[in-house]
Structures are given as structure tokens and as C-alpha cells.
Amino acid sequence: VFVSGAAGAVGSLVGQIAKAMGAARVIGSAGTPEKVQRLLELGFDAAFNYRDAPVRDQLKAAAHGNGIDVYFDNVGGEHLEAALAELNVGGRVALCGAISQYNATDATPAPRNLALAIGKQLTLRGFLVGGQRQHAAEFAGRMAAWLADGTVTYDETVVDGLENAPQAFMDLLDGANTGKMLVRI
């Protein structure tokens, strides 16, 4: 399993849930050495700083050349292209976010290698929590147990004062947070 934006609130939980549900190997990408270290502390088998080298090269190395079967996409862009290249036949992609495009002022190109999805028989599916209500009770039960026994933990970045909310939002878009960004009022 490869999770992009893995040090964020969603990505960090996705990686831990994948491990809790038996994923053989979980790989995460993040934007600072500290976030990479945090992913390893959370139980990710491998993590890399996407700023250090091309994402595809780092992903291939982290997967030991065996490819990946599942990609949870929080980022889009170069991460999605790298994942498409490294996904094995029959691989699955959950499209949850595209943070690489959130601040873009120009139209962003589609993945240049999207045609790989045909030959590899990939499944790409949009993911919204609200679209998964039928799993809410099961998820709540499992998550409560995982939180109680420490299988899953979470991080929060807390900013004090409503007057600091605009900067907190900008910091969120710039990836300055680890885990959930909260404004305490």
C-alpha cells in the first residue's frame, strides 16, 4: 500500500489502518525529514521525502522493485503518475485528494501515463467519507478498539486564536502541519 501525503490527518490514519488490516507493506510520502521519521514511528514500513528525488524512483526503491497493489491518493500530480507506473496488474487506487493542485493558478495536466490503467487493468475510484455511510458502524467499532489499544494514534497541530485561522489554513495548504490542523478559540 502506498499513501501520499501520509503525514496528514487522513494519510497517517490510512497507513495505520492498512497495517491493522494486514497489509504486508505500507509506504508513505511526506515533505520533510521530520514527517518521514514520524511515519516510521507510526508503523509505516518505509517512508520517503518527495522533495529529495523523483517520487517514482523513491517509490520503486521503497517497494523493493515489487510494485504496489493499492494506492491511496491525497496528492495527485507526480505522486499519481509514479503510482500508476508502479501499480501491479489489478491494482486499486482510492482518489481522495489532489493537494498538489489546490494552489495551482494554471490548469494542471492529467497524468501523462493514465493509459497504463488500461493495460494493467487498474481500478481508480473516488473516495469520500460521506459516500461510505454503510460502513460507519463497523468502522466506529474497529477504530474505537484500535485507538484504545494503541494500534492507531493521531497527531494534531494546534494553533491558538481565531485571528490565526487564516494563517493556519494557509499553513495547512503548504503542508506545515502534521496530522489534523486545529484552531483553538
Predicted features and spans:
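Glycine-rich phosphate-binding loop and adjacent beta-alpha segment
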Residues: 39, 78-152
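Short amphipathic alpha-helix with an adjacent loop that forms part of the alpha/beta core around
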Residues: 54-66
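C-terminal hydrophobic helical "lid"/dimerization subdomain
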Residues: 130-185
